[in-house]
Amino acid sequence: MFTKEVTDSKLYKWFNERLEIQAISDDISSKYVPPHVNIFYCLGGITLTCFIIQFATGFAMTFYYKPTVAEAFTSVQYIMNEVNFGWLIRSIHRWSASMMVLMMILHIFRVYLTGGFKRPRELTWITGVIMATITVSFGVTGYSLPWDQVGYWAVKIVSGVPAAIPVVGDQMVELLRGGASVGQATLTRFYSLHTFVLPWLIAVFMLAHFLMIRKQGISGPL
């Protein structure tokens, strides 16, 4: 993985004595790749790439977005029309969101059709399903943030769905909305979920997912 010039340098040797860089490098670069692996096994990596793009573009927009019912829509218009390359950043965010969902669905189908969920990879499959649920939640919460007519009514409908659940339904609706009706508290909750809670959750499950794949390797053919 490293060239001879790098491994012979004093700086590399200094770090290698303390961090065992060479052992880590050998482990990363020497993993066995089964001969049946094809391009469809890259769908999970493409989904991760889309998530990284989402994180970067979303982080950039937080500098200008204002999560209030009075200023949310105006701030989105400001990003699109006034911020340098703001229109491009937001467009990439939207396109990569759609691409992430599509790649995730195809990845799930690939894993299911090739039996990648079977023993001993049940936990890998479970973490993947949890991440799929979180990804859908990203879409639901992000859809509301522009606080336009589409976003407002989408939130009103989605947050009202739990009302059909017996006993606790009304309490769940009030928890989601932050009150009896959709308003500032709702937008604040959805913004917090979209930019803080869900990213941390998916990061934890991604780490567990990748560590298990690394430990168990790629599943064999059917």
Curated annotation (Swiss-Prot):
Heme c binds at residue 42. The keyword Ubl conjugation does not apply. One of its GO terms (cellular component) is plasma membrane-derived thylakoid membrane. It comes from the Bacteria. The chain crosses the membrane at residues 39-59, 97-117, 123-143, 193-213. One of its GO terms (molecular function) is oxidoreductase activity. Keywords: Electron transport, Heme, Iron, Membrane, Metal-binding, Photosynthesis, Thylakoid, Transmembrane, Transmembrane helix, Transport. InterPro entries: Cyt_b/b6_N, Cyt_B6_PetB, Cytb/b6-like_sf, Cytochrome_b_N_euk/bac, Di-haem_cyt_TM. Heme b 2 binds at residues 93, 194. GO terms for biological process: photosynthesis; respiratory electron transport chain. It is found in: Cellular thylakoid membrane. This is Cytochrome b6. The gene is petB.
